[in-house]
Amino acid sequence: MDTIVTAILLGIVEGLTEFLPVSSTGHLILATELFGYDAHQWAMFNVVIQLGAILAVVVQYWRTFWAVGMGLLRLEPISLRFLRNLLAAFIPSAILGLALKKYIDVLLGSPSVVCWALIAGGIAILVIEKHAKQGEPSGIGQLPLRQAIGVGLAQCLAMVPGVSRSGATIMGALAMGIERRTAAEFSFFLAIPTMLGATTLELLDNRDALLGGTMGVGWSEIGVGFAVSFVVALAVIRLFVAYVSRAGFKPFAWYRIAAGAVALGWLAMR
């Protein structure tokens, strides 16, 4: 398959799945298997196009970030708490990620692990949706520190490919009584430091390939994938918050279970 077409397809997969509770990393791993791509060749590409999804969050919520930034300059309590909560949620996965990244990549990056994680995550969403009590709408700067730390600890589960970073953080938030819209937006905002950190770490680990031009794919493919990921992720963010505020997360749970089961069957028959 043409590399530009491959870049477009993977950009669509990344943009569609990054902020939905279905695991973008898991879907990229399965897409690589399904279409027969060279996983090593496209590994760096899959990391870099996540920056397109990050940019989508910044564009969608730039007014929020501007207001928080101005509030920080004025030392406003709500803006200080916003930053405190974001850092408190980011730090657990940053520490654990640095400590365990190489082991997780080696031991848990297989398609079968992704499938089982999709199924387990789907069941967890159904259980949490059934039993979690919805809190009152509130902003991230109004959440107590313990809830922010809890969301950060939940994010650590997403180091297993197929669990889903957004799924883990949103479900962790719901389990602690945070209402759906705030849970989703907290997950979006938390993606920025988390994904920037992960991408920076990958780029540093692969700096020789970057400088030597041996990344496996060219800058044109990366540019196309980045742009497609950005556009698709922006559309998903705008639709997702409104949808889950009304309908909840059960459809994503059933999708995860079905996708994991079908993929397991396909892997077994290859």
Curated annotation (Swiss-Prot):
Principal subcellular localisation of the protein: membrane
Membrane topology: Multi-pass membrane protein
Enzyme class of the recorded protein, top EC level: hydrolase
Subcellular location per the Swiss-Prot or TrEMBL entry: Cell inner membrane
GO molecular function term, any single one: undecaprenyl-diphosphatase activity
Stated family: Belongs to the UppP family.
Protein name in the entry: Undecaprenyl-diphosphatase
Originating species: Novosphingobium aromaticivorans (strain ATCC 700278 / DSM 12444 / CCUG 56034 / CIP 105152 / NBRC 16084 / F199)
